[in-house]
Each structure stands twice: as C-alpha cells, then as structure tokens.
C-alpha cells in the first residue's frame, strides 16, 4: 500500500475492510467518548441529574462525568453564573485540553435569566466568558432536550476538520468586558439625611415679625367650624 496515494479498492476487497480517512476516524472517536465536566449552580442541574437514571441512561452516548477539567473535553454549564464565579469558570475552561466544547443549559446560563434583572452581580450569558457550541434554552430544559443537545454536538463534531480542531483557539475565545461600577449612596443607611436637618439657604424663610403678626390665639369654636 502506497502511503502517498489513496489505495485502490476493487471488488476483491473483503467486507471486513473499512476504508476511511484520519479525519473521520478522529471525529468518530471524539464524538463516541465525550467526557463532560458538570458545572451546575442552580435548578437546571437537577434535570441533568435525572439523565443518570435507567430511564434515559446517558452512558449509552459514551458520556463519562469527570471531576477534573484536565480529563474532560466537554463542559456543561447549568445555572446562574455570578461575577465572583466568572474567573473560576474561565479557569476551568482553560485547563481543559483541546479539543473542548461547551453546552450552555438553561435560560440563566444563556441570558442571565430572571436573576439578571437589575442585578449588578450576574453575568448575562456565559458566552461573554467562554465560547459556546450549543445553546439549550429552557427553565429548566427537559432531559429529552439535553439528549437532543448532545446529539447536535455529536453531529457538529462529525463535520469538523482535524486540522482546524487541533489548532489553538486563542484567537476565537471571548472574555467578559470590564464592567464599570458607580458608587451610589444607599438610601437605607440608618442615618438621618443632613439635607432634612439643615435645609439649604435658598429655602424661603419667614421673618420673626411676620410670624408674630399672624400669630393669635384660636378659640375652640373656630377649630370646630
């Protein structure tokens, strides 16, 4: 067999011989053995935990949960991500070997969800921190939807090119921008407002003469009427 040219197959080739390429072989081995790192922070992770049971049995897809990012090639984020958790999430992603993939599960992970409304400590989408391959909306998504997302990721891996996959992804990674915070005085400090105790000089004042001029005793009959 010539290592430079493609082998010539004829009708005499046995059925047990499989002709393929290195790219397809690499993609097949990758999609058949996805080892996920479960990054669950909220209620969406409970739905993913139901996949471990015998009803859905996610082991048939070759998914083996790992506790170390150095042994995982898929990170599944489920739940709200806060500003304090953002550096930890990015660090876990950086520790994963190439090639690596990300599934964003749930509305809180994709857009921040209801926790992002008037919140200064919630990240409005993990795609501002790490690149996301598959978005899985829902609050929370059903286990069937998680299986569908894994199937779509497997199809994406099957269409990848080997050279593009092993290429470092330093230029394609996106990180969160620096958020500018402004110091605002809290109205509930337990202290009296100085403006109420000491009104500004621009406030109109009543002179002493005017005060005593209109000050007169009022009878009870006038109060009743």
Swiss-Prot record:
> Per its UniProt record, what InterPro entries does this chain match?
NADH_UbQ_OxRdtase-like_20kDa (IPR006137), NADH_UQ_OxRdtase_20Kd_su (IPR006138)
Report the EC code(s) recorded for this entry: 7.1.1.-
- The residues that the entry says bind [4Fe-4S] cluster are 43-44, 108, 139
Going by the entry's taxonomy, the superkingdom of the source organism is recorded as Eukaryota
Question: Keywords, A to Z?
Answer: 4Fe-4S, Chloroplast, Iron, Iron-sulfur, Membrane, Metal-binding, NAD, NADP, Plastid, Plastoquinone, Quinone, Thylakoid, Translocase, Transport
| Cofactor field | [4Fe-4S] cluster
Single GO MF annotation: quinone binding
Q: How is the cofactor bound?
A: Binds 1 [4Fe-4S] cluster.
- Main subcellular localisation: plastid
Q: Where does this one sit in the cell? A: Plastid, Chloroplast thylakoid membrane
Write out the catalysed reaction. Answer: a plastoquinone + NADH + (n+1) H(+)(in) = a plastoquinol + NAD(+) + n H(+)(out); a plastoquinone + NADPH + (n+1) H(+)(in) = a plastoquinol + NADP(+) + n H(+)(out)
Q: How is the quaternary structure described? A: NDH is composed of at least 16 different subunits, 5 of which are encoded in the nucleus.
What name does UniProt use for this protein?
NAD(P)H-quinone oxidoreductase subunit K, chloroplastic
Name the species this protein comes from.
Answer: Crucihimalaya wallichii (Rock-cress)
């Amino acid at each position: 067999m010539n290592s430079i040219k493609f082998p010539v197959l004829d009708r005499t080739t046995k059925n047990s011989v499989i002709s393929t390429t290195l790219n397809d072989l690499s993609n097949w081995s990758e999609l058949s053995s996805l080892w996920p790192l479960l990054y669950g922070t909220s209620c969406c992770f409970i739905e993913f935990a139901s996949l471990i049971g015998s009803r859905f049995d996610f082991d048939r897809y070759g998914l083996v949960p790992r506790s170390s990012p150095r042994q995982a090639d898929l990170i599944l984020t489920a739940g709200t991500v806060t500003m304090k958790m953002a550096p930890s999430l990015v660090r876990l992603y950086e520790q994963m070997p190439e090639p690596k993939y990300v599934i964003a599960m749930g509305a809180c992970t994709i857009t921040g969800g209801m926790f992002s409304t008037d919140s200064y400590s919630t990240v409005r989408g993990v795609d501002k921190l790490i690149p996301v391959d598959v978005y899985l909306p829902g609050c929370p998504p059903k286990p069937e939807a998680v299986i569908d997302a894994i199937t779509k990721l497997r199809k994406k891996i099957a269409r990848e090119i080997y050279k593009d996959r092993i290429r470092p992804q330093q230029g394609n990674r996106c990180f969160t921008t620096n958020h500018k915070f402004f110091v605002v005085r809290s109205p509930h400090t337990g202290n009296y407002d100085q403006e109420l105790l000491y009104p500004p000089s621009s406030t109109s004042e009543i002179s002493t003469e005017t005060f005593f001029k209109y000050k007169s005793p009022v009878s009870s009959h006038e109060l009743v009427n």
